[in-house]
């Protein structure tokens, strides 16, 4: 068999920014570079939202952190690679969480009887103010980072708080986990409690200092520009953040059309905008050459959907949070049919935990409710589609991630379902579907990120 040619240009797709180390690799961290190896087991991965590939007792080949493909028989040219045989276990791509809030991890599962804006004022903002205390931040973020390390998540886009030093601490801790993450210092200079609101110049100065402090510091962790949402950011702040975005070529994350009250509020604040997303687009932070994630997207008008498609915006679908905070049910079937980039977000603490498998199950369930109660022309999501959203769908924001196709960074989970007893044999697809609904971190035997074994 002829040796495959690998394109080294895709080997470190980490959402880099100007000032990041070359290929996202810090010179201090070079000893952690991935090796060549083969994993054997029952392998499942997505090619697209409708094509789930399952290979029984297949071989997954890794060359310098990159997938060289999945094979039923191991090609001779890889025969000398170290091989780990995982027997009857499932091997699937690592999961991507496109939206969660690290400082909210401490109150997950609380305040779920409130709607969004009340929940922010009574739960979220008081908790986030505590991160001005570095001792508290260290205790809380250490718990978060450790639990993320042992979860099924291999890549994540994370909101921190307005506090620069605590944000840098969070990035330090996430770097130690070995996961690939984008972390953002939050910007907010209006309509916020006194304990959290920044002066516009202060917000910009601290953001610039944050970017300077972390330059060249990490291999796996990169910054993402994080204006919380339009209601908490003045026009001046947004205009100046756009200049920073252009200077550092930063990706952007924020919230969009989560709640009807929020949408009305944005219309009051930005009466010149056609729709919520148009306000972001006005400031140059809505795709169109800028890698952008918008979380929720529950109530988009048709023009907003078209703009997201035209601009290549990523949707972070957060089904559990949208349910807990009574926000609504996002039209994910529409997003898939329109070809809009879509992945999943746990949205801790709007979501009660960090399980992206749980987010897959929630996405299926709420799509059934939308189909039955709102629009019977929009078919519910299938298990294959939900799995795609949690792997390749969201992984695309990081470049070539979330699949075992040749040329993709190799993020993998080894799943052990021996404890999930069944009276008869199940197909690989059936076993995977069970993991979506009833698995937890105890079923993960091994975890790899870009070819490096985490545990």
What name fits each language-model region?
Residues 48, 409-455:
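C-terminal cap of metal-dependent C-N hydrolases
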Residues 282-288, 333-421:
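His/Asp/Glu-enriched, well-ordered alpha-helical/loop segment
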């Amino acid at each position: 068999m002829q040796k495959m040619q690998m394109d080294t240009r895709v080997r470190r797709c980490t959402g880099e920014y100007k000032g990041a180390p070359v290929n996202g690799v810090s010179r201090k961290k070079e000893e952690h570079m991935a090796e060549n190896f083969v994993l054997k087991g029952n392998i499942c991965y997505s090619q697209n939202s409708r094509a789930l590939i399952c290979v029984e007792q297949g071989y997954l080949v890794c060359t310098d952190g990159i997938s060289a493909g999945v094979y039923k028989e191991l090609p001779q040219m890889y025969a000398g690679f170290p091989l780990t045989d995982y027997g009857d276990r499932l091997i699937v791509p690592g999961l991507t969480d496109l939206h969660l809030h690290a400082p909210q991890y401490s109150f997950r599962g609380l305040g779920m009887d409130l709607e969004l804006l009340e929940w922010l004022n009574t739960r979220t903002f008081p908790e986030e103010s505590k991160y001005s205390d570095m001792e508290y931040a260290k205790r809380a973020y250490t718990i978060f980072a450790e639990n993320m390390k042992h979860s099924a998540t291999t890549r994540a886009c994370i909101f921190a708080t307005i506090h620069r030093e605590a944000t840098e601490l969070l990035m330090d801790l996430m770097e130690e986990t070995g996961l690939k993450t984008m972390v953002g210092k939050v910007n907010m200079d209006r309509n916020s409690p006194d304990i959290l609101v920044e002066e516009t110049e202060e917000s910009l100065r601290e953001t610039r200092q944050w970017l300077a402090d972390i330059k060249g510091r990490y291999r796996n962790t990169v910054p993402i520009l994080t204006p919380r949402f339009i209601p908490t950011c003045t026009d001046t702040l947004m205009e100046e953040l756009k200049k920073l975005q252009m200077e550092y070529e930063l990706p952007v994350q924020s919230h969009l059309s989560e709640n009807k009250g929020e949408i009305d509020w944005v219309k009051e604040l930005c009466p010149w905008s056609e729709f919520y997303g148009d306000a972001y687009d006005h400031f140059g932070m809505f795709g169109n050459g800028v890698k952008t994630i918008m979380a929720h997207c529950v109530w988009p008008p048709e023009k907003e959907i078209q703009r997201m498609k035209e601009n290549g915006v990523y949707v972070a679908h957060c089904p559990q949070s949208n349910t807990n905070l009574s926000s609504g049910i996002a039209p994910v079937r529409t997003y898939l049919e329109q070809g809009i980039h879509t992945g999943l977000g746990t949205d801790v603490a709007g979501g009660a935990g960090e399980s992206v498998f749980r987010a897959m199950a929630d996405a299926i369930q709420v799509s059934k409710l939308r189909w039955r109660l709102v629009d019977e022309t929009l078919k519910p999501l299938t298990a294959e589609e939900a799995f795609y959203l949690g792997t390749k769908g969201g992984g695309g924001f990081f470049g070539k991630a979330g699949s075992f196709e040749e040329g993709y960074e190799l993020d993998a989970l080894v799943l052990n379902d021996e404890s999930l007893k069944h009276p008869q044999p199940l197909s690989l697809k059936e076993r995977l579907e069970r993991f979506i609904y009833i698995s937890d971190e105890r079923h993960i035997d091994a975890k790899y990120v870009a070819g490096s074994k985490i545990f």
